[in-house]
């Protein structure tokens, strides 16, 4: 019955422009119209990562709930954690519309939204109303016209410190001109120094250390990956998120929209993002937490991220095609995998296909 409702809801939403459909889905979650398909708790899926206790490894990626409108509603439908944002200090409209495109044949999305959001103030007010137990991360970015982008990230740390369970510094969106330049070694070193100094200062004041993750692009050279790994380890960062959207259009079936500018996400991103994940795991070693994201559409693809080196997994675009029951289905599938393979913990499969994925030429 739930599957039929999801199918009908998807058909209805696909009658709308993608951005309008996104807004309607937020309203549905706010109103409680989305039924919970959460899976039963399974201790084999729980784990502690970066000092945080996760009930299951499946999270909602940043980009869906940009303004912190529905974080707790997302947790109720089966996600183990959720990440709001990207939020910038000042509100900004983002790029001109249309800026969001469905590639239905590929089960993919191209976006050039450009960090459209209501700013720190609006998101902070909403997060203050959330339970302190809710596992909500805050994805921070810089305003497009900022004179000092690093200062914008520092402002994000200080503004949300009391309400964030973790932070993600997003330096890998392709839709803010020059933002990916912060992945270059000298710039990245300056950013990490400033962000972690702000975090440590806030921790001294409040007695609680909030972990900071870095979200990177999948379109990195081998040298670029070397530089990021070196700086992340040198600065003692808490973790990585691999990866953001790609500029590549390789292998797409839907050629009508493939030439739209912006970042590609969804199923076609899976192989590329998973290969980069494995290569980064090889570079940073076994202990640094990594969240794998990109093309996760099923329990099998989620498990494959873990086999390639991820501790946790996020998704977003595939839920557009699979519906709000997707996180629950994935969690049930991971429980079934643990049962089938007699695993004490889902962590037992981590890195089991690390060599395969790190060697993939994608």
UniProtKB/Swiss-Prot annotation:
Keywords: Cell membrane, Flavoprotein, FMN, Membrane, Oxidoreductase, Pyrimidine biosynthesis. One of its GO terms (molecular function) is dihydroorotate dehydrogenase (quinone) activity. Its EC number is 1.3.5.2. GO terms for cellular component: cytoplasm; plasma membrane. It is found in: Cell membrane. Binds 1 FMN per subunit. Belongs to the dihydroorotate dehydrogenase family. Type 2 subfamily. Monomer. This is Dihydroorotate dehydrogenase (quinone). The lineage of its organism: Bacteria, Pseudomonadati, Pseudomonadota, Alphaproteobacteria, Hyphomicrobiales.
């Amino acid at each position: 019955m739930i599957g039929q409702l999801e199918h009908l809801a998807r058909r209805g939403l696909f009658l709308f422009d993608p951005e309008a459909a996104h807004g309607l889905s937020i309203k549905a979650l706010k109103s409680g119209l989305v039924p919970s398909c959460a899976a039963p708790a399974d201790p084999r899926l729980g784990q502690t990562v970066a000092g945080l206790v996760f009930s299951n490894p499946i999270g909602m990626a940043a980009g869906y709930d940009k303004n912190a409108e529905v974080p707790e509603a997302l947790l109720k439908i089966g996600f183990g954690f959720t990440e709001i944002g990207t939020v910038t200090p000042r509100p900004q409209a983002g790029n001109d519309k249309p800026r969001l495109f469905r590639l239905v044949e590929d089960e993919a999305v191209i976006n050039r939204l450009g960090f459209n959001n209501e700013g720190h103030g609006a998101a902070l007010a909403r997060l203050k109303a959330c339970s302190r137990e809710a596992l909500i991360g805050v994805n921070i970015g810089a305003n497009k016209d900022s004179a000092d982008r690093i200062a914008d990230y520092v402002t994000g740390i200080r503004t949300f410190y009391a309400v964030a369970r973790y932070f993600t510094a997003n330096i890998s969106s392709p839709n803010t001109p020059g933002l990916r330049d912060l992945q270059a070694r000298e710039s990245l070193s300056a950013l990490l120094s400033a962000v972690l100094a702000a975090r440590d200062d806030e921790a001294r004041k409040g007695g609680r250390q909030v972990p900071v993750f870095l979200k990177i692009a999948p379109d990195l050279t081998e040298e670029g990956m070397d530089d990021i790994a070196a700086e992340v380890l040198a600065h003692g960062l808490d973790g990585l998120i691999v990866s953001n959207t790609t500029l590549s259009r390789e292998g797409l079936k839907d050629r009508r929209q493939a030439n739209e500018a912006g970042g590609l996400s969804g199923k076609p991103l899976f192989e590329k993002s998973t290969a980069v994940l494995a290569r980064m795991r090889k570079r940073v070693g076994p202990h640094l937490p990594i969240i794998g994201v990109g093309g996760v559409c099923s329990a099998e693809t989620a498990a494959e991220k873990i086999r390639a080196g991820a501790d946790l997994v996020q998704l977003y675009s595939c839920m557009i095609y699979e519906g709000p029951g997707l996180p629950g289905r994935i969690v049930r599938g991971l429980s079934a995998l643990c049962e089938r393979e007699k695993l004490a913990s889902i962590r037992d499969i981590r890195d089991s296909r690390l060599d395969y994925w790190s060697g993939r030429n994608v």
